[in-house]
Amino acid sequence: MIREKKSFHLHMLSDATGETLISVGRAVASQYATSQVTEHIYPMIRNETQLRRALDEIQQELGIVLYTIIDKKIKLLLKKRCEKMEVPCIDILHPVLDAFQSYLGTPTNLRVSAQHDLNADYFRRIEALDFTIEHDDGKSPKGLSDADVILVGISRTSKTPTSIYLANRGIKTANVPLIPGIGFPEALLEAKNTLIVGLIASAERISHIRQNRDLGHGFAVESYTDRISIAEELIYAKRICERFGWPVIDVTRRSIEETAAAIFELLSWFREGKWKKNPS
C-alpha cells in the first residue's frame, strides 16, 4: 500500500513560457488539498545545457515532473534521467496531440515557431493587463475605443476584478462606473467596435460589500450603503443598458470566473456579428 504524502515537489519544464503547463499543474494539484505542493518552474528549456541545469535541481528535490517540450532529443534525455531518478515524467500535450492527429488524420506539425506563438500570446496578455489597469474605473476615457470589452455598472459590481481576469486572458478590458446624476463619458458611446456589458448585483450584496470596503464616489455614508438608494442606482444602470442595447449580467451568484465565461460567450457572438450592438 502506498503511503499518503503530506507534501510533494512539482517540477514543470517548458520550452516556452510555461503558462499552459502551470495552469494544468495547478489545476491537478488543487485536487489534492491535503498535500502541500512546492512548485519548481523551468521555462525556456531549449537546449541540453538548460535541461541539465533543471535536472540537477530535480535531483535535489525529487517529485512529479510535467513538461511541454517539442524537441525530441531533449524529451528523450529528460525521460531517461527521470527513469534513473525513478520519478514520474509526463508530457501533458502528447495525449492531446495524439487525439488531434487521430481525429484529423493529419500528422502533428511540431514546429519551432509554435514556441513564438506562445510567447506572442504571453506578451499580448501583458499588453492587455497594462491597458486594463490604465482604463480602470473610468480612467483615460479617450482610449475606450481600443478596448475589446467595456464593463459598466454601479460601484461594487465586480467590474475591476472581472476586468483583470479578462485581461489575464488577453482581452483588453476597460470599466466605467455608472453614477446617477453624473453620467458617463461620451467616449463610451463612440466605442462602436467594442462589446459593452453591464454588470449588476442584488442591492443586498452590494450593500454588504460597500459596508466592508472603503466608501467613495462622493456619496454620503447612508446613501452609499442604503439598500433603497442602491436599488435606485441599479434601476438607473439598467435603464442606461437597455437604452443603448448593452447586455446585462447579474453577478449576484456568480464567481468572477463564471462572469468572465459569460462575457467570453457574448464576445464570441459579438465578433461573429450575432450580437447586434446599439440596436436603437
Curated annotation (Swiss-Prot):
Molecular function terms, GO-annotated: ADP binding; ATP binding; phosphotransferase activity, phosphate group as acceptor; protein serine/threonine kinase activity
Domain of life from the UniProt record: Bacteria
Reaction catalysed by this enzyme: N(tele)-phospho-L-histidyl/L-threonyl-[pyruvate, phosphate dikinase] + ADP = N(tele)-phospho-L-histidyl/O-phospho-L-threonyl-[pyruvate, phosphate dikinase] + AMP + H(+); N(tele)-phospho-L-histidyl/O-phospho-L-threonyl-[pyruvate, phosphate dikinase] + phosphate + H(+) = N(tele)-phospho-L-histidyl/L-threonyl-[pyruvate, phosphate dikinase] + diphosphate
Enzyme Commission number(s) from the entry: 2.7.11.32, 2.7.4.27
Keywords: Kinase, Nucleotide-binding, Serine/threonine-protein kinase, Transferase
Pfam families according to UniProt: Kinase-PPPase
Residues given in the record as ADP binding sites: G153, I154, S155, R156, T157, S158, K159, T160
Group of enzyme by EC: transferase
Stated role: Bifunctional serine/threonine kinase and phosphorylase involved in the regulation of the pyruvate, phosphate dikinase (PPDK) by catalyzing its phosphorylation/dephosphorylation.
Entry similarity comment: Belongs to the pyruvate, phosphate/water dikinase regulatory protein family. PDRP subfamily.
Name under which the protein is recorded: Putative pyruvate, phosphate dikinase regulatory protein
Gene source species: Bartonella quintana (strain Toulouse)
Taxonomic path: Bacteria, Pseudomonadati, Pseudomonadota, Alphaproteobacteria, Hyphomicrobiales
